[in-house]
């Protein structure tokens, strides 16, 4: 397939390889009913994360976590140990089949969104898991394929994100799939396992029609924010990931215009310059996560939050997608009258508009996350729309002129 080719989403022969791209740059896509979700955004990414679908973060959905029998467990690893493998497999299968459904994808499409980012863990390639020392749910890949099929039919662009890396890329955080005491990812053994995963998922993406709208693969989410400690990641893992992904694509005779975009956290993230050791930057992309609530340099006031967001220039590397952000504020003020969600909707509307205005100076944005069980909208796009804070027509937020 050639650059700028138009792809209509029709059934493909099983032997046909599926290609990757950036929407409206490399090709145009439409849903099965003929809708081009990128037409209104002029090619900008506007998306939501599928948080807790395949890498469960208990804080997002404590009720669902408890119903699985995982109450009190810190991570997927811990829950599988507690339940036992067979019981855990059944519990997680029920979760995978109910947390994000085809109805969710239809609703996402209806809100003028055009992209989903799907966090996944290396344990989805089950033969990578050391059965004596590592414990993760089994059977997730079939549900990933089903989800991506729904999204492709809807005309949504898909980013797959290695959220949980072997050994854990950061300690004490369930988004790695395990509540590890130390970050064990940064060595040749764990890099090797991650590379095997990247080869495998790349091959799966190009071989299945369900993955036809997967155009980007993030090779590790949120590594340590310490450039010195992760030097080997930049010098070894990043270049090797490019080589292994491209080799897998070449083995399948994928044309260069059909390659996956390979995504890394940008320089602003704090893990050093991702380009430092790269010799091949073809179809490279970058990710930035912007949470003002955790930025100690930002004074906490509503006026400052809006002005800071309006002035954000997240262009340390290009093209950059702001792959995580929210409407959440520091915990010590979140419940105070000045920041109350019910009485300050006008502020949250403006702050949403300010953030997307800034992020669309770059390639676009993906909100964290689509849905939660937190009882509010600051972390939940679905609930923010229901509350009237986020409009169904995203352009109407941009047209508010908050940053003018």
Swiss-Prot record:
One of its GO terms (biological process) is cell wall organization. Its main location: secreted. It catalyses: Random hydrolysis of (1->6)-linkages in (1->6)-beta-D-glucans. It is found in: Secreted. GO terms for molecular function: glucan endo-1,6-beta-glucosidase activity; glucan exo-1,3-beta-glucosidase activity. One of its GO terms (cellular component) is cell surface. It comes from the Eukaryota. Residues 1-20 form the signal peptide. Glycans are attached at residues 33, 130, 253, 299. Keywords: Carbohydrate metabolism, Cell wall biogenesis/degradation, Glycoprotein, Glycosidase, Hydrolase, Polysaccharide degradation, Secreted, Signal. Its EC number is 3.2.1.75. InterPro entries: Glyco_hydro_5, Glycoside_hydrolase_SF, Glycosyl_hydrolase_5. The active site is at 222 (proton donor), 324 (nucleophile). Beta-glucanases participate in the metabolism of beta-glucan, the main structural component of the cell wall. Acts on lutean, pustulan and 1,6-oligo-beta-D-glucosides. Belongs to the glycosyl hydrolase 5 (cellulase A) family. This is Probable glucan endo-1,6-beta-glucosidase B. It comes from Aspergillus terreus (strain NIH 2624 / FGSC A1156).
